[in-house]
Amino acid sequence: MVEVARFTAAIARTPGLTNRLFTAREQLTRSGHPRGQASLAARFAVKEAAAKALGVPTGMDWHDCQVVSEDSGRPRLEVTATVEAAAAVMGVTDWRISISHDAGIAAAVVIALG
């Protein structure tokens, strides 16, 4: 869970944080518009939950854990490099995610399958 106001404040006071946490693809909606702070906070909640499911891999790059939207709008987790390697060690081969944001809170559930 991520408090949207706290997340927004952290982004505002830390130059470059958005680019460190999110790929260019994640920062835009499927129609190419900038994604809102609540949506970014929810995507960060997914990344944080995935990292915790893997025991917070040493040297994890946030870009190696990307939340993308399918054509249907359904969110999907794509893992590469550092996160993919950590998942392989744990036998994780697939992910299920759910994202929500309401009343100033962004929440995510991540299930690592293998």
Show the residue positions of the predicted features.
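Core catalytic alpha/beta fold that binds nucleotide/phospho-ligands
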Residues: M1-G114
